[in-house]
A protein has these predicted regions:
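Helix N-cap/capping motif at the beta->alpha junctions
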Residues: 28-41, 63
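Receiver (REC) domain active-site loop signature in two-component systems and cognate sites
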Residues: 58, 70
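Alpha4 helix (beta4-alpha4-beta5 surface) of REC/receiver domains from two-component response regulators
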Residues: 65, 77, 82-85, 94-110, ...
Length: 135
């Protein structure tokens, strides 16, 4: 699995990378703008990401805008929503209303509330069919 981890917090990026150790190869980005550029480059190189783990609150371009941009790029390439890259959004917002708004607005495959645990991440990846390992 080829993954892009996007978070402006270095510790957050490193923690997710540690959780994915042995499950995926990964790149990192510090904001939405960099994520979009890395996504474009991965597609151009013929090795597109299978998964993007994307924080919502970031400088320059937030996670909502990055996800919308990536989905728009997929649409322009004729990729149907069910065949697009899996995007897991991360957010500190934890009320049901916030979770639904974040999930829908970012057009994500899944949503995780921070702090993210290894078990929650692996369970989410399992539900998305990206891994078959038990947590």
């Amino acid at each position: 699995m080829n993954c892009l981890i996007v978070d402006d917090d270095e510790l957050g990026r490193e923690l997710i990378a540690e959780y994915l150790n042995g499950q995926a190869s990964f790149d990192m980005a510090v904001n939405g703008r960099e994520a979009v550029e890395k996504y474009k480059a991965s597609c151009a190189s013929g090795t597109p990401y299978d998964l993007i783990i994307l924080d919502i609150l970031m400088p320059e371009m937030n996670g909502h805008e990055a996800a919308k941009t990536i989905r728009r790029m997929e649409q322009e390439q004729g990729v149907t929503p069910d065949k697009g890259v899996n995007i897991i959004v991360l957010s500190a917002l934890n009320t049901p209303k916030d979770i639904i708004e974040t999930y829908v607005s970012a057009q994500s495959s899944a949503h995780l509330v921070k702090p993210v645990t290894r078990e929650k991440l692996l369970l989410t990846l399992n539900k998305l069919g990206m891994i078959s390992e038990e947590c």
